[in-house]
Amino acid sequence: MHSTEDEYFELADFYKLFSDSSRIKILFVLLSGAHCVKHIAEKAEMSQSAVSHQLAVLRRSNIIRQTRSGQNITYSLADDHVKLLLELAIAHIREDK
């Protein structure tokens, strides 16, 4: 498989999103489905402001999506590729344990 130099940089930037444990916690909460900030904060044991900040980073990078229904906003994984990446990564980590 051959890629361009731009794709290498884009891929490196993509994987940097997974280098923050707070973002990983949030993504694992979202594996179970769409949630509001308050619920994500509770499940990830983080403050709502910290969760909101990380959600903005993930949303700008198209890792998650935001859905508004009236005044309610929920967040979910953008697609099954993100779910698969997380599942493969955790399987790899647990492989040697």
How would you name each of these model-derived features?
Residues 42, 53, 59-60:
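Alpha-helical residues within the helix-turn-helix
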Residues 15, 74-97:
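Conserved segment of winged-helix/HTH DNA-binding domains
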Residues 48, 53-54, 93:
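Generic helix-packing signal
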Residues 1-9:
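Short, intrinsically disordered or compositionally biased N-terminal tails of bacterial proteins
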Residues 9-50, 69-80:
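N-terminal helix-turn-helix DNA-binding core of bacterial DNA-binding proteins
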